[in-house]
Curated annotation (Swiss-Prot):
This is Oligoribonuclease. It is found in: Cytoplasm. Belongs to the oligoribonuclease family. It comes from the Bacteria. Its EC number is 3.1.15.-. It holds the Pfam family RNase_T. The active site is at 128. Transmembrane segments: none annotated. It comes from Pseudomonas savastanoi pv. phaseolicola (strain 1448A / Race 6) (Pseudomonas syringae pv. phaseolicola (strain 1448A / Race 6)). Keywords: Cytoplasm, Exonuclease, Hydrolase, Nuclease. One of its GO terms (cellular component) is cytoplasm.
Length: 178
């Protein structure tokens, strides 16, 4: 099953944007082949956080994660940050050798900052390169502004990854010239 051409897609939901003061509350992973065909979906994990930690979320995060049901899932979860890291790493080891896949997603540098701070063993599994779909989004907005990819906005980790993969397929078809 392991293949160094496979890609690891990851998305995190956090209590905010600062990895020094905010924490991960949900994570999900998907493995695709190099042609962006989904091979496997990993665990979708709500990471337990205390009510005190959740109370520190700003208005946007409180509204978004409360409305999606994520805040309640986080409260009810018994999975620690370390357990979430271990479960995710166990899954990706089945599919991708160490340091062969870039970390893939949308605005993935932000997720990588949180992994570096809170899940360093998992972060170290990735190649040092990033496959960031938002780079193509920014280029298309400037060079081909007529191209628009319509995104949803659930801000749930697995939905966000599926959307990122679909968005990259869209840019491959409509923006990247062979």
């Amino acid at each position: 099953m392991q293949n160094k051409q496979n890609l690891i897609w990851i998305d995190l939901e956090m209590t905010g944007l600062d990895p020094d003061t905010d924490v991960i509350i949900e994570m999900a992973t998907i493995i695709t082949d190099s042609e962006l065909n989904t091979l496997a979906e990993g665990p979708v994990i709500a990471v337990h956080q205390s009510d005190e930690t959740l109370a520190k979320m700003d208005e946007w995060n409180t509204r978004q994660h409360g409305g999606s049901g994520l805040t309640q899932r986080v409260r009810e979860s018994t999975i620690s940050m370390a357990e979430a890291e271990a479960q995710t790493l166990e899954f990706i080891k089945l599919w991708v050798p160490e340091r062969s896949s870039p970390i893939c997603g949308n605005s993935i540098c932000q997720d990588r900052r949180f992994l570096y701070r809170h899940m360093p063993t998992l972060e170290n599994w990735f190649h040092y390169r990033n496959l960031d779909v938002s780079t193509l989004k920014e280029l298309a907005a400037r060079w081909s502004p007529e191209l628009k990819f319509k995104k949803g906005s659930t801000h749930l980790a697995l939905d966000d990854i599926r959307e990122s993969i679909a968005e990259l397929r869209f840019y491959r078809e409509h923006f990247i010239k062979p």
